[in-house]
Amino acid sequence: MIKPILRQIISYLSISCILILLFSCVNKSNTNKDHLVFRYNEHANINTLDPAFSRTLQDTWVCNQLFNGLVQLDSDLNILPSIAKDWIISEDGLIYTFNLRNDIYFHKHKLFGKDSTRTVVARDFTYSLNRLKDEKIAAPGSWVLNKVDSFKAVNDTVFEISLKQPFPAFIGLLSMKYCSVIPREVAEFYGTDFRSHPIGTGPFKLKRW
């Protein structure tokens, strides 16, 4: 009579230990990933996660976490490199030549194929900024590029912007989130729905909204 009871006790303890170990592993796994997740609550409505349309403070704040441009501002409003590691302005103030970093990748997406990602190259800026200017897109941030004559991808890491006339404040305008780089293949795949399926280069990738 004692042996069956002992067997039951041993079986119960064994199952309990296994369950405890399983739950411990799950909890440990979740805990290890928690530091990689940024949860954000916004009291105002977010209208879009497409940087070309991010005209409100709440839209811009979120897009700041998802996208990058050629340059950025620090807390003292100094212009600093971002994807462009440096730049040269011609003596006549008409041509801005940007040397791009070659280690910046887009967030992972199936449209990128086998590796699920790819590096940002100059033609991505040509596409992104031409899209911003496109009257058919009707982006509210298009005014930022009113002084621009053309964009040119010299090669993968050299990008040129030609102005219609000298405009010293132009480099500062490029720090606005409107001028973020986006991947053409993803933007064209989603169309207007890119606003809720953003793929950029920022420190965070959108999980859900």
Walk through the language-model features, giving the residues of each.
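A structural "hinge/loop" feature
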Residues: 44-60, 83, 110-116, 141, ...
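Aromatic- and charge-enriched surface segment that lines or borders ligand/interaction sites
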Residues: 85-135, 160
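Immediate post-signal peptide segment of exported/extracytoplasmic ligand-binding proteins
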Residues: 29-39, 200
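N-terminal lobe/hinge region of extracytoplasmic solute-binding protein
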Residues: 41-91, 130, 137, 197-201
